[in-house]
Amino acid sequence: MDYFTLFGLPARYQIDTQALSFRFQDLQRQYHPDKFANGTQAQQLAAVQQSATINQAWQTLRHPLTRAEYLLSLHGFDLASEQHTVRDTAFLMEQLTLREELDDIEQSKDDARLESFIKRVQKMFDARLQQMVEQLDNAAWDAAADTVRKLRFLDKLRSSAEQLEEKLLDF
């Protein structure tokens, strides 16, 4: 059973996150291992396994990138274990330039410049995310997979910038 079915949701990117949360809580109550403490060893093991599956499904579907990756996996794109890389040279050059800019910001310890950088990267991420949503809605799986690969780069860059922000605030 796929994760969408487990939570009673349609297998598409745009989901009702409130319904996801309610169903998660319901499933957790239903299959919590403590409810099977007096059961057989087989029942206890099954409850632990089911609870682990529910938690994994919840973690996967609640985050936009992992939800997209999972949806793509249902359509034959295993992005989690693939060795495929982004082939868009212009995008890769832009990422290199942004990484260099972040390094410069780290050296200069310029808070205002870092704040501007984070906002810019977030805007880039949001634009790509919207592009990916449209691609998934239109079942453009190849294009969506490529966009997810690019979103991973932007997500890592955003995370690095936010870590730098925390580091600069600690001084």
UniProtKB/Swiss-Prot annotation:
GO biological process: [2Fe-2S] cluster assembly; protein complex oligomerization; protein folding
Keywords carried by this UniProt record: Chaperone
Domain J: 2-74
UniProt GO molecular function: ATPase activator activity; protein-folding chaperone binding
SMART domains: DnaJ
Listed GO CC annotations: iron-sulfur cluster transfer complex
UniProt-listed Pfam families: HSCB_C (PF07743)
Cross-referenced PANTHER family: IRON-SULFUR CLUSTER CO-CHAPERONE PROTEIN HSCB (PTHR14021:SF15)
Family affiliation: Belongs to the HscB family.
Role played: Co-chaperone involved in the maturation of iron-sulfur cluster-containing proteins. Seems to help targeting proteins to be folded toward HscA.
HAMAP family registered for this protein in UniProt: HscB
Assembly information from the UniProt record: Interacts with HscA and stimulates its ATPase activity. Interacts with IscU.
Protein name: Co-chaperone protein HscB
Native source species: Salmonella paratyphi A (strain AKU_12601)
